[in-house]
């Protein structure tokens, strides 16, 4: 889970930044492993702030929230709101089924253009570093 990743980064001396919706705060689910907490009203505000402050979005294995963030960034890029890209960090093939779905949608003509212009894939840490370089 994201909390485990934040703890590992925090414990290693890395900076961890959390964009925290008020509902998460109200429910007492804010990670204790944040170097910086940026409060926001809701998930839409969270995505807007993350997009505003990011150069690229690296998607680690995650659930529905991560999928929401991936597709928000990719979809808004396809229609010209920004030129930011998503990198799926495909640790142990985690994103393989999503990649297969995207390939199928591409083949069926449901995605205009090449989705790889907006969503890139890194199957290893070396590939991730290369894409970020």
Residue ranges of predicted features:
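Anion (oxyanion) recognition and catalysis
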Residues: 6, 10
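Short, small-residue-biased leader/transition segments that mark boundaries at the very start
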Residues: 1-2
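Short, acidic/small-residue loops that bind anionic groups at enzyme active sites
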Residues: 19-21, 60, 76-100, 113-115
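Glycine-rich oxoanion-binding loops at beta->alpha junctions
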Residues: 19-54
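A charged, well-structured terminal subsegment
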Residues: 52, 56, 107-133
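Short, aromatic/basic amphipathic alpha-helical patches
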Residues: 98-108
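Active-site/ligand-binding-proximal alpha/beta "capping" segment
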Residues: 44-80, 87
């Amino acid at each position: 889970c994201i909390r485990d990743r934040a703890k590992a980064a925090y414990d290693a001396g890395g900076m961890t930044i959390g964009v925290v919706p008020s509902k998460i705060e109200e429910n007492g689910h804010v990670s204790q492993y944040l170097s910086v907490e940026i409060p926001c009203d809701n998930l839409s505000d969270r995505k807007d702030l993350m997009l505003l402050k990011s150069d690229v979005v690296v998607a680690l294995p995650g659930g529905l929230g991560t999928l929401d963030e991936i597709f928000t960034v990719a979809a808004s890029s396809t229609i010209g709101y920004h030129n930011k890209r998503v990198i799926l960090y495909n640790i142990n093939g985690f994103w393989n089924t999503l990649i297969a779905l995207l390939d199928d949608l591409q083949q069926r003509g449901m995605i205009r253009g090449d989705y790889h212009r907006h969503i890139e894939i890194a199957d290893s840490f070396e590939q991730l570093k290369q894409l970020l370089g």
